[in-house]
Amino acid sequence: MEHGYTALWRRFQKALKQRNQLLRHGRMDEDSLRAWTAELIPLSEQITDFRKQYLADLTKQVLAVAGRFDGLGVLELEYYQGWDDQLSLEEVLAGDRTRDIATGKTNHGAHKADIRINVDGVAAAERLSRGQVKLLVYALKLAQG
């Protein structure tokens, strides 16, 4: 799986780089922008699928490891895919077109993904002490093997 993900990520990075270069130009080639956008969308979706599966597996391990530490509370790992999950990436990028051109970059996609960690329903950064954050980091590292 790791090799497949790495190859996929490289293809995604190439498409993102090409799309962003087009967005930065004052006069852009619309056909090229459409082509790189069409390449970027399925790659983003495939990367998202890989990551969701990885996080689901990791979450099980993290919960098992974190359960050995006192005082961490109820952990929840949430995956943010880099765009509103109620919309397709195609819809989001179409809606972002003006903003993307103005900023010269692609504002949504797999490159904007994040993992949000909550403890007892509150962001871990707001809830945990520095010592508890260290325990959480240890749990994450141990869970990854």
For every predicted segment, state its role:
Residues 2-5, 23-26, 47, 51:
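Flexible interhelical turns and helix-capping residues at alpha-helix boundaries
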Residues 28-145:
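Conserved NTPase motor "head" modules and their coupling/switch loops across ABC/AAA+ ATPases, GTPases
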Residues 1-22:
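Extended, charged alpha-helical "arm/stalk" segments used for dimerization and assembly
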Residues 5, 9, 26, 30-33:
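Amphipathic alpha-helical coiled-coil segments with heptad-repeat character
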